[in-house]
Amino acid sequence: MSLFLKMETFVYKNFIVPLQGKNTFDFVSEHYQKGDRVLDFGCGIGSNSKLFNPVDYIGVEVDESRVGSARLKYPESQFKQIPFISSEDDKIPFEDNSFDIVFISLCLHHIDSSTCKLLFREFKRMLNQDGKIIGIEPCILPNKYFSNVFMNVIDAGDYILSIDEYEKMYSSESYNIDHIDIVTTYGYHLWQYSAKPNELDSNSYVGGMTKYRKLIRPLHLTTLYGKWAVLIYLLYLIIVPIIN
């Protein structure tokens, strides 16, 4: 695993996941019942596996090193490396109607809209008739300029969107969205939602980086990100109470 990924994983594991805490547990508990078959897409190092009964759960990830870390830390759960989905011909290696829930936590904002649309089609194929997606993503909020910039500084994802844009992207692949909540944890605004497939036809959607990301992205093209990510986060924790 590269230094960049190690630093990002450190921040995610030691700050973002613990700070979500009970909010994520309560959110998942509203939708998941023991016996539901769950696909955790973009499971990373497996931290969310403990939200589900191990026999119900399988986590998938394209990064082999993260799958290895997840297997070591959570041996009671199942993890699988999957190929990157980049065309209509690429498939996630599971049968149709295999899952009751697709869980997506802090993943989509790393993926461009054209690939998200391909993934949404695959999720629809793999979900059973009453199945749904439940997800958590950082979101841009109106008039929250400092935290909107902060999320883009600390996060490696290029596509932290507004809730409206996330909804448009899902709707373009025939999903109905149920807005659940917005949880704020030390500068991260986390949108909790569910999405269920409908029978409408798909339509076009082309998204991209927000103005915040376009401003911040050059920082991520240097070697400074991994070196300074934790320091920036700690400075934020110090500064926010002062300015508020």
PLM feature spans:
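Class I SAM-dependent methyltransferase Rossmann-like catalytic core
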Residues: 1-22
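Conserved alpha-helix/loop element of class I SAM-dependent methyltransferases that forms part
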Residues: 17-34
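Conserved class I S-adenosyl-L-methionine
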Residues: 35-44
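Class I SAM-dependent methyltransferase SAM/SAH-binding core
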Residues: 44-90
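Short conserved loop adjoining the S-adenosyl-L-methionine
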Residues: 90-96
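A conserved beta-strand element that flanks and buttresses the S-adenosyl-L-methionine
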Residues: 103
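A short glycine-rich, Lys/Arg-flanked "PGG" loop and its adjoining helix->strand segment in the class I
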Residues: 117-129
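C-terminal alpha-helical "lid/dimerization" subdomain adjacent to the S-adenosyl-L-methionine
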Residues: 135-173, 177-190
